[in-house]
Structure formats: structure tokens, C-alpha cells
């Protein structure tokens, strides 16, 4: 009985050590992650939204050039069709 109790104690100590080592590894990984302040993140977000054109807001950015809108080309090619779908 004494031998099994000591083995059990060793196993518990090993599991505790393993859990502590896993937590230590997670904390090391978190320390290596790049961090920026909230104000810098806001500035980066503002810079992105003011420099990237979003044609979903035509009042702000206007409409895309005609040669870049492939949906417009598809519409003009099939405008004379009276059907709603094409069977291939």
C-alpha cells in the first residue's frame, strides 16, 4: 500500500509540473506577440478607411470605372435576352 501511495504522489506531482510548464509556454507565447496601443490601432484603422476605396459607398468614393466592373459587361451582353436564366 505504501508503494502505490508514493507512486500516486509522484504521478500527481508530475501532472502538476506538466500543467505549470504548459502555462509557462502559453505565457511565453503571449509575451512574444506584437502589441500596439489602442490609439495607434485607431490611427491605423482611420488611415486604412480613408485610403482604401470602397465602391459600396458611392456618395463618398463615386462609382468604379466602367472597365473594372465585370458585372456591368455581363449585364449589357445579356440585356436583350427575355429569359431569367440560361441552361447549359
Curated annotation (Swiss-Prot):
InterPro entries: G-protein_gamma-like_dom, GGL_sf, Ste18_fungal. Pfam families: G-gamma. A lipid is attached at residue 84 (S-palmitoyl cysteine). The modification Cysteine methyl ester is found at residue 85. Residues 86-88 form a propeptide. It is a peripheral membrane protein. GO terms for biological process: G protein-coupled receptor signaling pathway; pheromone-dependent signal transduction involved in conjugation with cellular fusion. Keywords: Lipoprotein, Membrane, Methylation, Palmitate, Prenylation, Transducer. GO terms for molecular function: G-protein beta-subunit binding. The keyword Lipid metabolism does not apply. Its main location: membrane. A lipid is attached at residue 85 (S-farnesyl cysteine). It is found in: Membrane. GO terms for cellular component: Cdc24p-Far1p-Gbetagamma complex; G-protein beta/gamma-subunit complex; heterotrimeric G-protein complex. Signal peptide: none annotated. Belongs to the G protein gamma family. G proteins are composed of 3 units, alpha, beta and gamma. This is Guanine nucleotide-binding protein subunit gamma.
